[in-house]
């Protein structure tokens, strides 16, 4: 496994980048290129569907690379090439458990691109999520780009995670400069690898809490923030506030002032309903009803993560919907 000539885009963070981390990036990128060249594809499902698949007879261990890097199943040391296994072990991309090996990352397909993210189950506080929400988020961005005539010079993906949103924009608008921001160093690192693998040179990954670490205004702001209420307060999952809606509301408040005339916010999130009332919409409608904006609100899926209704805090919730809020700053009329 040759890792000497694998360029990785620089990640801008508020701390120095260790040499070990740079080597990790090279190995991850080389692995991604190998999987891509071999025609690897995997669609990541919900955690519950993942659990059900892995619980089936014969699925306790991996038989091929999709089992290893998609289904996160433990595997025998001889399943991958020896040199590749050694490099992945050395960089903690795979680990040894009870005589078997296990990947610490997953690789998922989105259109023609591959994305590295955290392995199943995503229990660590710095997990980088990718799943059905990511696919719907990408669809929402694609729909907006296909209908909008506004020129995009500067765009940003807030809470970028794997960088999927930023990379979708960068591929569709090669002339745009796209920032991918997150508070999670693992997310920034994965975003840099994924951008390099996608062949985009107009994405930069930065540490920022929403927009606090950025400057200037944007022609397009996109976000797919955590929207669940999580007792463990895991950053990739917990949206805070009333049934997980606080971060989404905060993004709306902070983003609108940073839109250029004609610029848009495309926010994909979850909206819990209690007694027929959409709690997220009830909080943001007074904000977006300002005269300077026009907006649309769409339910992409009326019922997601239904199993969460059995968890503490959701006893009064009827459902959680996957929604897209699009807010556009109305351009000033020319004189």
Predicted regions span which residues?
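Short, flexible/disordered intra-domain loops and linkers
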Residues: 235-240, 275-278, 312
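Conserved Class I SAM-dependent methyltransferase catalytic core
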Residues: 247-303
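Core SAM-dependent methyltransferase catalytic element
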Residues: 310-335
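Mobile active-site "lid"/loop adjacent to the S-adenosyl-L-methionine
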Residues: 185-187, 223-250, 254
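Class I SAM-dependent transferase core
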Residues: 99-146
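N-terminal auxiliary segments of SAM/dcSAM-dependent transferases
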Residues: 5-111
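Conserved SAM/SAH cofactor-binding pocket of Class I
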Residues: 131-223, 229-233
């Amino acid at each position: 496994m040759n890792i000497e000539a694998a360029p990785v885009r620089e990640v801008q963070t508020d701390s120095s980048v260790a040499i070990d981390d740079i080597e990790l990036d090279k190995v991850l990128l080389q692995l991604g290129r190998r999987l891509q060249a071999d025609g690897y594809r995997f669609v990541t499902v919900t955690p519950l569907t993942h659990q059900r698949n892995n619980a089936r007879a014969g699925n306790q261990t991996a038989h091929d690379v999709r089992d290893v890097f998609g289904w996160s199943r433990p595997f025998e040391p001889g399943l991958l090439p020896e040199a590749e296994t050694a490099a992945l072990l050395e960089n903690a991309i795979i680990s040894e458990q009870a005589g078997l090996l296990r990947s610490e990352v997953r690789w998922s397909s989105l259109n023609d691109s591959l994305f590295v993210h955290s392995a199943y189950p995503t229990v660590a506080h710095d997990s980088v999520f990718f799943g059905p929400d990511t696919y719907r988020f990408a669809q929402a961005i694609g729909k907006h780009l296909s209908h909008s005539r506004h020129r995009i010079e500067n765009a940003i993906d807030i809470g970028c995670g794997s960088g999927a949103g930023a990379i979708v924009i960068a591929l569709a608008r090669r002339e745009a400069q796209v920032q991918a921001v997150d508070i999670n160093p693992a997310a920034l690192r994965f975003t840099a690898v994924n951008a390099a693998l996608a062949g985009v040179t107009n994405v930069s990954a930065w540490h920022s809490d929403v927009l606090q670490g950025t400057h200037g205004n944007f022609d397009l702001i996109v976000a797919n923030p955590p929207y669940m209420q999580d007792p463990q307060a895991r950053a990739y999952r917990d949206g805070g506030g009333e049934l997980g809606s606080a971060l989404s509301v905060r993004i709306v408040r902070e983003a609108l002032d940073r839109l250029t005339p004609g610029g848009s916010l495309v926010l994909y999130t979850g909206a819990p309903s209690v007694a027929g009332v959409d709690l997220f919409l009830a909080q943001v409608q007074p904000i977006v009803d300002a005269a300077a904006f026009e907006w649309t609100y769409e339910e992409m899926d009326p019922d997601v993560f239904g199993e969460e209704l059995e968890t503490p805090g959701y006893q009064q919730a009827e459902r959680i919907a996957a929604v897209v809020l699009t807010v556009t700053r109305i351009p000033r009329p020319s004189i």
